[in-house]
Regions:
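A detector of single, family-specific signature residues
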Residues: 1-275
Length: 275
């Protein structure tokens, strides 16, 4: 008889461990086993399982493997949830954890309706988010390379007499420095070159964002955000790429809660602590 099946998947880089449980509180889960973390292997499992099920409900935890499995399954017409790991109910006395138990737990909790789904971004939004995060990585790398160069200069008592660091005059001054030992000269030049390379990387990624934003579905919202004082193109794109579709928030309070900009309280007895 065809039944509704809930399928818990413990997803790793190379494998997916699968547990299946039928609807109905008396039904017990069973371990299907592990398959390769490849879409072809997942399709084969679906073809084999769907013949004995009225509906399949998949679930796996959000993690480093991303949303590829979710998008593939939903495009095939299956129901799939990506569960928030921080919201999964835990048993305090449970000291055993392995892939099979995790898959069974996900299947059980999904059947019971006790899991909370994470927001899965649109593929184009996620692509823009990858680009803005790549730029942020470049900004961090540039800042650290500047700090290392500054530390080298300070350690060797080299002080710039000009007013503004990282200006053309500053780099001209750097190029005129002659260190007493060849090894130090090589080190100085490497620090300088690294700063130049990282700054070029930041500029290159910034230009790419400017070129790609007009074709992005959220381009009108980017323009609207820029109407606010102090909000540049990069800030607007970064915020929207991280938040995704703003219509998923029913009201401003939900958006503020998502960002963590809500009051908190940790009080007990006479101790009152609000933040």
């Amino acid at each position: 008889m065809n039944t509704v099946k809930f399928i818990g998947m413990d997803v790793h880089k190379k494998t997916i461990t699968i547990a299946i449980i039928d609807e109905g509180r008396q039904k017990q889960p069973r371990i299907y086993g592990s398959i390769a973390n490849q879409l072809e292997a997942l399709d084969k499992f679906c073809r084999k399982t769907v013949s004995t099920a009225a509906r399949l409900h998949f679930v796996y935890e959000a993690g480093p493997c991303g949303y590829g499995i979710y998008r593939h399954l939903t495009q095939k017409g299956f129901d799939c949830m990506v569960a928030a790991p921080s919201m999964i109910p835990k048993k305090s006395g449970d000291r055993i954890k392995n892939d099979r138990r995790d898959a069974v737990m996900l299947a059980r909790l999904h059947r019971a309706g006790e899991l909370t789904a994470v927001y899965v971004p649109d593929a184009q939004d996620e692509a823009m988010r990858d680009l803005t995060r790549a730029r942020e990585d470049a900004v961090v790398a540039a800042r650290k390379s500047k700090q290392r160069l500054n530390a080298f200069l300070l350690r060797n008592s080299l002080t710039f007499a000009g007013r503004t660091k990282w200006s053309k005059a500053f780099f001209n001054w750097l190029s005129d420095i002659a260190m007493p030992y060849p090894a130090q000269q090589v080190a100085l030049q490497e620090y300088i070159d690294t700063v130049h390379e990282n700054l070029k990387r930041v500029n290159r990624l910034t230009d790419q964002i400017r070129q790609l934003v007009p074709a992005w579905r959220l381009a009108p919202v980017v323009s609207a955000l820029q109407a606010a004082r102090g909000v540049s193109l990069i800030v607007a794109v970064t915020v929207l790429a991280e938040l995704g579709d703003l219509s998923r928030f029913d009201n401003p309070s939900q958006l503020m809660a998502h960002l963590g900009l809500v009051p908190s309280e940790h009080s007990s007895g006479e101790n009152i602590k609000r933040g």
